[in-house]
């Protein structure tokens, strides 16, 4: 499969890589679309201190499950999914209080582990969220960035009288 790989800062190549196989609890996603985020640019330029090289970037992606690992229902095959790139342990204190984004063992697809700028990606099944057929692909790829705005709005709880600056 072809993958966009940042070998080191400012060095991008398209590389042929082996087709990944899903492990226990994982699914393999045939990627249809991926969004480009500022953080992908930061990794390319070497401005993300958490990125490890070489790295397949891309944390905003959408596709279809084409293989499942042990322990994952075969009914997931063929599902259209958006991928939550934040992989958390589910057991540490932040996870136990509903804040998996600050997990003590946090792994982010496209930063710490290869992401979605590839033809296929293996991700935990719990991070692959079913997308109804009524949602077009071009909108489904935007689920991850939309969740950022939705989360901030949920925490800020703005009212009609509030003024917000979006940067």
Report each predicted region and the residues it spans.
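N-terminal glycine-rich cofactor-binding segment
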Residues: 3-21, 38-67, 82-83, 100-114
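Active-site/binding-pocket entry motifs
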Residues: 11, 35-37, 71, 87-88, ...
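A generic structural signal for well-ordered coil/turn residues at beta-strand boundaries
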Residues: 13, 23, 77, 116-117, ...
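NAD(P)H dinucleotide-binding glycine-rich loop of Rossmann-like/cofactor-binding domains
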Residues: 89-167
């Amino acid at each position: 499969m072809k993958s966009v790989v940042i070998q080191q800062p400012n060095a991008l190549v398209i590389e042929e890589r082996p087709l990944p196989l899903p492990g226990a609890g994982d699914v393999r996603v045939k990627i249809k679309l991926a969004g480009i985020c500022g953080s992908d640019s930061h990794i390319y330029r070497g401005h993300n201190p958490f990125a490890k090289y070489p790295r397949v970037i891309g944390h905003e992606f959408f596709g279809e499950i084409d293989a499942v690992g042990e322990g994952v229902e075969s009914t997931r095959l063929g599902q259209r999914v958006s991928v939550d790139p934040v992989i958390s342990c589910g057991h540490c204190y932040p996870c136990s209080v509903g804040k998996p984004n600050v997990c003590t063992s946090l792994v982010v697809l496209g930063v710490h582990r290869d992401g979605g700028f590839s033809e296929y990606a293996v991700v935990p099944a719990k991070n692959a969220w079913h997308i109804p057929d009524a949602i077009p692909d071009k909108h489904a790829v935007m689920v991850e960035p939309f969740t950022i705005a939705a989360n901030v709005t949920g925490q800020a709880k703005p009212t009609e009288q509030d003024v917000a600056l979006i940067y």
